[in-house]
Amino acid sequence: MNRLFRLLPLASLVLTACSLHTPQGPGKSPDSPQWRQHQQAVRSLNQFQTRGAFAYLSDEQKVYARFFWQQTGQDRYRLLLTNPLGSTELSLTAQPGSVQLIDNKGQTYTAADAEEMIGRLTGMPIPLNSLRQWIIGLPGDATDYSLDDRYRLRELNYTQNGKTWHVTYGGYTSDTQPALPSNVELNNGAQRIKLKMDNWIVK
């Protein structure tokens, strides 16, 4: 299959929206009770959704899109990528043991692993299995991470399939309890992924 994306070049607009602002102030210890309490509060969120701006940047391709992420239960989530005109470029629906992806031509694909499938079909090696944790400010399987001055995740390093992802958090929203990320950037040296969340809805 050819590249799924034929997005319009609103690069400057989206990149500006996705620019990161590193939190200031001294970091806190990952062993602190405040961090454990924050993690417990985030893990208790069974259902949530967010939307915003997405950018994928590499030497091979540059993709700019709007995204919608919805989790409806453990291992049940939906990801939509739309172009600047609002047309759906990719729709991915995951549930335990099964993933379905529909491309911009209406073609449907199924697989057992979302991460493998989206990388194979789009050419974008997005670490979806880890991103599900990182997008809500949890380190997932990463053990090398640091906190900001409010006991929230500030950055982490995680090696997967020979690639080390460096993840930085540019801010958190105060509109939700617990606070959730408003900017996240993933960088492995060859690829960068930027997410700017416009809003969160939690249950």
Curated annotation (Swiss-Prot):
A lipid is attached at C18 (N-palmitoyl cysteine). Its main location: membrane. One of its GO terms (biological process) is protein transport. InterPro entries: LolA/LolB/LppX, OM_lipoprot_LolB. PROSITE patterns: PROKAR_LIPOPROTEIN. A lipid is attached at C18 (S-diacylglycerol cysteine). Residues 1-17 form the signal peptide. It comes from the Bacteria. It is a lipid-anchor. GO terms for cellular component: cell outer membrane. The keyword Hydrolase does not apply. The keyword DNA-binding does not apply. Monomer. NCBIfam families: lolB. Belongs to the LolB family. HAMAP family: LolB. Plays a critical role in the incorporation of lipoproteins in the outer membrane after they are released by the LolA protein. This is Outer-membrane lipoprotein LolB. It comes from Klebsiella pneumoniae subsp. pneumoniae (strain ATCC 700721 / MGH 78578).
